[in-house]
């Protein structure tokens, strides 16, 4: 049985992420989606919200598990007995960072492979950062995220705007 881990912040989980999960889950016996509790990033959605979103969107895949992790990816990979780390590459600009991370992961986990996957054509330009920015500026993100995620984005943006108005 081959277990793979697909780590990320998923802030928010997009149609591009789901595309990779759908395709990777057809390759591996088990795909563990690792939602990172990263100290280096200031997420728009907190960890609990990101886990809820991931479970809402990905819950229908029988061989996909959604879990959070903190600390080094190598420890999460080991705990889950994974043999593969799945990473998405949207553009050449992603490659340099991902290549360096794959090299470090190979050093730390010599028996674990990193597999790069490119998103389907219609999702190559989508990123969580761009989706958040569009949502915060009042734009339509319905083509980039699932309806439940769009609703959460709208609610979060409205709450932030109310908080700003209350504390000018």
From Swiss-Prot:
Keyword match Nucleotide-binding: yes
Catalytic activity, reaction form: (R)-4'-phosphopantetheine + ATP + H(+) = 3'-dephospho-CoA + diphosphate
Record GO terms (molecular function): ATP binding; pantetheine-phosphate adenylyltransferase activity
Cofactor: Mg(2+)
Keywords, in A-Z order: ATP-binding, Coenzyme A biosynthesis, Cytoplasm, Magnesium, Nucleotide-binding, Nucleotidyltransferase, Transferase
InterPro entries assigned to the protein according to its UniProt record, in alphabetical order: Cyt_trans-like, PPAT, Rossmann-like_a/b/a_fold
Pfam family, one: CTP_transf_like
Residue sites binding ATP per the record: 9-10, 17, 88-90, 98, 123-129
EC number: 2.7.7.3
GO cellular component, one term: cytoplasm
Pathway(s) where this gene product acts: Cofactor biosynthesis; coenzyme A biosynthesis; CoA from (R)-pantothenate: step 4/5
Residues that bind substrate: 9, 41, 73, 87
Similarity remark: Belongs to the bacterial CoaD family.
Quaternary structure and partners: Homohexamer.
Entry-linked HAMAP family: PPAT_bact
Protein name (Swiss-Prot/TrEMBL): Phosphopantetheine adenylyltransferase
Gene this chain is encoded by: coaD
